[in-house]
Design a protein with these regions (language model features):
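Activation corresponds to long, low-complexity, non-globular regions
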Residues: 1-7, 135-142
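Short beta-strands within extracellular/lumenal beta-sheet-rich domains
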Residues: 2-27, 88-91
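Short edge beta-strand/loop segments characteristic of extracellular beta-sandwich folds
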Residues: 19, 35-41
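Extended extracellular/luminal ectodomain segments enriched in beta-structured repeat modules
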Residues: 24-36
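Beta-strand-rich ligand-recognition modules
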Residues: 39-138
Length: 142
């Protein structure tokens, strides 16, 4: 069934089964970095957020102590179709071994704030070292 969006009361934990099809170890280019992006609504700045992936704590602290992006701070005028999330928390993945192809266990808990928090989306981003411009424009061998 549909896992997101999901409401999360203060002090409770949201657990998601997160399937992933991409295997960075099988990619043509080496992995430069990977991060996890989590979308929230009604996340109070004083809330303590804990993010766990496959049993490993990746982030624990105030949203402002991480890479936190508030959508309304970047958008000059309201979009005709706004994002479901009001803000995003980006968490760097230390290496590709943390997340594996197949099912992954994602957990997030929030303590603090007077209203329930809504987790709107979850995304893994891979950044590969590719020199496609250099490959495309290379000088032929003589």
């Amino acid at each position: 069934g549909k896992q997101l969006p999901a409401k999360l009361a203060s002090g409770s934990e949201l657990r998601l089964s997160f399937p992933l099809g991409e295997d960075p170890k099988a990619a043509t280019f080496p992995l430069r970095s990977a991060d996890l992006r989590i979308g929230f609504r009604a996340l109070a700045p004083e809330s303590n957020v804990v993010v766990t992936l496959n049993g490993r704590t990746l982030f624990s602290g105030l949203p402002a102590s991480g890479a936190r992006f508030v959508t309304r701070e970047f958008v000059t005028k309201p979009s005709r179709q706004p994002d479901l999330a009001e803000e995003y928390l980006h968490v760097a993945l230390p290496n590709e071994a943390v997340i594996a192809p197949g099912q992954n266990d994602f957990r997030v808990s929030v303590v603090g704030g007077s209203k329930p928090v809504e987790v709107t989306d979850l995304e893994v981003r891979y950044d590969y070292q590719n020199d496609l411009g250099q490959i495309w424009n290379r000088v032929p061998a003589r």
